[in-house]
Amino acid sequence: MSLFEKHKDVLARAIEALHARTFFAAFPEHPSPAVYGETADADGQAQFKARLGKRFEALKQANPDGWVGEEESPYLQEPLNIQYPSFTVDHLVSSSRQAFNTWRKVGVDDRAGILLEALSRIKDRFFEIAYATMHTTGQGYMMAFQASGPHAADRALEAIAAGYEELQRFPNHAVWDKPMGKFNIQLSKEWRAVPKGVSVVIGCSTFPTWNSITGVFGSLITGNPVIMKPHPGAILPIAIVVAEIQSVLADNKLDPHTCQLAVDTADAMITKTLVEHPDVRLIDFTGNSLFGSYLESLPGKTVFTEKTGVNSVILDSVDDIDKVMANLAFALSLYSGQMCTAPQNFYIPSAGVKTPQGMISFDEVARKLADQINGLVDNPKAGPFVLGAVQSKKTTERVKEAETRGAKVILKSRTFDNPMFKNARVATPMLLEADASRKELFSQELFGPIALLIKTKDTDQSIALAKEMALSHGAISCGAYTTDAAVREKIADEMALAATPVSFNLTGGIYMNQNAAFSDFHVTGGNPAGNASFTNPEYVTRRFTWVGHREPAKV
């Protein structure tokens, strides 16, 4: 049985899910022993620990120039001391170009089968990847398992499904028969989906697998070789993924350099040299807007970016203010505000928020939000696991600097005790108050656990400001609370014009931070927060070109 035959059913279900946009998950998100095996968690933790202080030798990339690695656990604030093979840019690109000549000629069914097999093997590494993610990013255990494991794999499957379908859109061959009166002109025509070439995927430090895997699999399914360039602070999770892809390639007598890992250090980064190489044709990037905009400006490259944005919450009217504040407190606290979809700017009318019991004043809304944050943080069974740890020292410095920005401090950021990791780098959410006239205080992303409560004249001004921020600075998510159908429609319409998806009236166990593969488009590509979207047709069709040949038909 071919790998395509082995996995074709899940591919068919994934393609169906792309169109239905209802719930679909091929990889169970709960780390249950009943699903993954009684010893899966312990085995994964042991596998992770066995890598510490050693060379990562699972890759099939021979003859490195050296071995480098500088990852540090945000929980232990100690180096992992894992060393990865490093290569020159010319070597990486040359190896990729050589692999391209073989990979592009592999049929789409076989490509899909190989990539689906890789995902099935990656599934067996979910727990090892989870611990690797925890100790490079600072994510809590559950998020690390879900985001880097099943949720990332579902996004990869989504890219495979989208690419596979687009590559089937047109026939490979057709006979063109044009009547000309007493005779016909007949041409035999063929069409080829031609991959663009070497693809570079640039990872980030907070979601090294989830944010990168869609680009990796999107390029591979469309016939392009991939060079995965992770952030120097978060290599291990995606290194495991690349190793599994290489293993499947080698098992099927294909060049493992079809997917390579390209590591560097903060003091000797290779990213610019790599992306500026004339043979690099495709670039996927997650990170800051300055570097993302530079990548978008490079001539002759097809670039897919997710950059920074200013995410808003519009508070107009609610049924239950306490449930709303509990939901928003969790959204703010989740992974200490280090998600690209985390809320930052909360627009609240100066008169307050309407409820069935009457108006809740601005100050009372602020107090309730602060109380909910404190209640979550101080809950030893929830706080440490929800907040996790802070990935970068720069983020903790940004939190300290935020107190000096000139806004009123409603709730100070503080540390807390993590019972499992006494030396964890932690910070609780900070709440600042600003008037709507002080745009300089809230017109940029403040990455980390920082939120601003902005006092507006009314909901119309709240909507206008949220739209302005999205159009000018980008936005990936928006939350809105209103019980008024007309207000809801106005928010939906105005934010749609700013290419920003809105989550309305969320309470309970669903949050504006979250996106579901096969249903939610992650980033729209329509505002400055990024030019691409997980996973619409354009995300894969821009990775190849349709080319047609024709000749007289043989009668």
Kindly give the residue locations of the regions a language model identified.
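C-terminal segments
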Residues: 1-63, 92, 144, 148-171, ...
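Residue-level signal for inorganic ion chemistry
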Residues: 111, 223, 259, 283, ...
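Rossmann-like NAD(P) dinucleotide-binding subdomain of oxidoreductase/dehydrogenase enzymes
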Residues: 167-325
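Short helix-loop capping/hinge motifs at secondary-structure junctions, enriched
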Residues: 320-324, 352-358, 437-441
